[in-house]
Amino acid sequence: MNPSCVVYVGNIPYEMAEEQVIDIFKQSGPVKSFQLVIDPESGQPKGYGFCEYHDPATAASAVRNLNNYDAGTRRLRVDFPTADQIRRLDKLLGPSRYGYYPQSYANQSYTYGNNFGSYPPTQPSTQPLPQSYGYPSYPPAGYRGGSARPSGVLANDEVYRVLAQLAPNEIDYMLSAIKALCLEAPEQAAQLFETNPQLSYAVFQAMLMKRYTSESVVADLLIPAGVNLPGAQEPNRGYFSPMHTYSSAVPGPISVPSAPYGRASSTIAEVSPMYGSHAAPYASTPSAAVGSSRGSTPASATVPISPARGFPTTSAYNPAPPAYGMANPAYGSTGIRSSSIPSSGSIRSPSLTTTSAQATTNATNNITTTTAAQDENATKAALIAQLMALTDDQINVLPPDQKERILQIRQALPSSYKTESK
């Protein structure tokens, strides 16, 4: 049985007979067989079954057109069977349904337990391949490929030998399980095929053995022997690729982007011994010390490079000051490896830096206070000018209490305000 030719039919009314269901599914094409699942204890139908067509295209048409079909009291559910449903169908039909393989499906030699040595030992490749189940011949020798195992058998030959020992319904079950996995968990299926390339070959080889695909398709997917895969030996491009292992050689020189305050571009030169053998590579500039009027770190200081992407780390531009009294002569007073020690004039004392910061803060506070006082005085002056500009007629119109207050304020003002207002 080809699982791709079978459709699952669910939500079947209990009073509907098999002949009625078959008549419905004949609308998509000729029906090869229909199996209605019956409860063995009660003898009543369970409400679902399996319809088999002669080709996958007709089965796909039934899924598209007959899903949610109105069957009287219910609407039919039509879909491709899952791996669990195919397993139930195999148990329902039994080995006698196929009739052309002698071994039982539950044979102990085909169970998937911890004993992986249940298969017979691999024979040399010079012996003919097994043909016990009438499978088609193996692809041409030019497309067998694969690396030879210690026994002298090619890897693809060994995959075919294992598949040739399986019964036809076991291969169908394997293909249906792979199909269900690809539909339900495509990411896990992709990871499975990437980590187990032999499984990918086994799937296509099984499809070829069951005549579900042509030989030319498998031949196009295989790589002939002697052809090197692209990217097998990539040249050293000077960066760490996530696909490379850490045991590979150290990459070539990396140009560091130019930084402000006199830092020039540099290349990887050495690994700092202060971090041990697992430290990140460091970039070193020419030995000439290029100072700055601001007292910044000289250009000869080394810049640590990130081992993951080859860019300078943040700590390279903001190095932490070392503890006083613990400075290493090899690294200078700044705690950074340098080929030349900068002069004392280019390094500020911590006490002077603290004093300068405090003075700057005090000056900023004084400027803020002065600005606020000036704004307040300007506002008062504007109000007084408006008050003195009032005429006697305007003052007489005001209420008595406001009139009295304005007169008191005008009398209390100095004579200079009165002169300016006039």
Swiss-Prot record:
One of its GO terms (biological process) is nuclear mRNA surveillance of meiosis-specific transcripts. InterPro entries: CSTF2_hinge, CSTF_C, CSTF_C_sf, Nucleotide-bd_a/b_plait_sf, RBD_domain_sf, RRM_dom. Residues 337-358 are annotated as: Disordered. Its main location: nucleus. Keywords: Nucleus, RNA-binding. It is found in: Nucleus. Pfam families: CSTF2_hinge (PF14327), CSTF_C (PF14304), RRM_1 (PF00076). The keyword RNA-binding applies. GO terms for molecular function: mRNA binding. GO terms for cellular component: Mei2 nuclear dot complex; mRNA cleavage and polyadenylation specificity factor complex; mRNA cleavage stimulating factor complex; nucleus. The keyword DNA damage does not apply. It comes from the Eukaryota. Residues 5-83 form the RRM domain. This is Uncharacterized RNA-binding protein C644.16. The lineage of its organism: Eukaryota, Fungi, Dikarya, Ascomycota, Taphrinomycotina.
